[in-house]
Curated annotation (Swiss-Prot):
Its main location: cytoplasm. GO terms for biological process: CMP-keto-3-deoxy-D-manno-octulosonic acid biosynthetic process; lipopolysaccharide biosynthetic process. This is 3-deoxy-manno-octulosonate cytidylyltransferase 1. It catalyses: 3-deoxy-alpha-D-manno-oct-2-ulosonate + CTP = CMP-3-deoxy-beta-D-manno-octulosonate + diphosphate. Belongs to the KdsB family.
């Protein structure tokens, strides 16, 4: 049986690398609408766009999606979702999935599976996903977030650094990253997709920001710092990359162009 869930898409215009990103045109529709369509395909009972920009809310509503105005001072997408959860008064056990607003190619099946993964792990406050890394360049890329897991695939830590560090494999080559071998042991890349229970979302803003969260700029570390558990669904295939730069946008825009005949 498919786990019922609500999908919320946090979207802000103030992107430093790609201004007005949520409204970027993808085949005649704004990016945030393309993401909302993916969430709807995943089977969400309700799809909401959460933003501090009226233009984003208008774009969502113009295409038939619900939209909620939020404050502009949220430090993370999870904080923005927490405001929505408090405003709409969802029951404690409602499963809420945070679908990143710059992921118009996100697999709807993965969205649905992460929601179900949370339901299957009642001791965990959050569920997310990861996939194996096979390229040494990704291991050492700080823009690729890694996650270390315990025996039950519950997160031990998330980092932009290469974790776990293979002393015998990496130390002889350090600091020549180009000479590093491909990992011969499991290294997992975190996929920025989260499922929460509404009860936890309402608690999240009351938790003080953690030093490790601020250092790594990874919002999920606040939950770990305060003793919460994060269940990680392992998927063998890497998801399509999100949109962070003008080059990323051009690549994805090409995919939404009608095929020429």
């Amino acid at each position: 049986m498919t786990q019922p869930f609500i999908a919320v898409i946090p979207a802000r215009l103030a992107s430093t690398r790609l201004p007005n990103k949520p409204l970027a045109d993808l085949g005649g529709k704004p990016m945030v609408v393309r993401v909302a369509e993916r969430a709807r395909e995943a089977g969400a009972q309700q799809v909401l766009v959460a933003s501090d920009a009226q233009s984003v809310l208008d774009a969502a509503r113009d295409h038939g999606f619900e939209a909620v105005l939020t404050r502009a001072d949220h430090p993370s997408g999870t904080d923005r979702l927490a405001e929505v959860a408090a405003t709409l008064g969802w029951s404690d056990d409602t499963v809420v999935v945070n679908v990143q607003g710059d992921e118009p190619l996100i697999d709807p099946v993965l969205v649905r599976d992460v929601a179900s993964h949370l339901a299957a792990h009642p001791a965990c406050a959050i569920a997310t996903a990861a996939h194996p890394i096979h390229d040494a360049a990704d291991v050492f890329n700080p823009n690729v977030v890694k996650v270390a897991l315990d025996a039950q695939s519950v997160a031990l830590y998330f980092s932009r650094a290469p974790i776990p560090w293979s002393r015998d494999a990496y130390q002889p080559h350090w600091p020549d990253v180009a000479a590093m071998p491909a990992p011969a042991f499991p290294v997992y890349r975190h996929i920025g997709l989260y499922a929460y229970r509404a009860r936890f979302l309402r608690t999240y803003p009351t938790l003080a920001q953690a030093p490790i969260e601020q250092a790594e700029q990874l919002e999920q570390l606040r939950a770990l710092w305060h003793g919460e558990r994060i269940a990680v669904l392992i998927t063998e295939s890497a998801p399509e990359a999100g949109i962070d730069t003008p080059a990323d946008l051009a690549r994805v825009q090409a995919l939404f162009q009608p095929s020429s005949k």
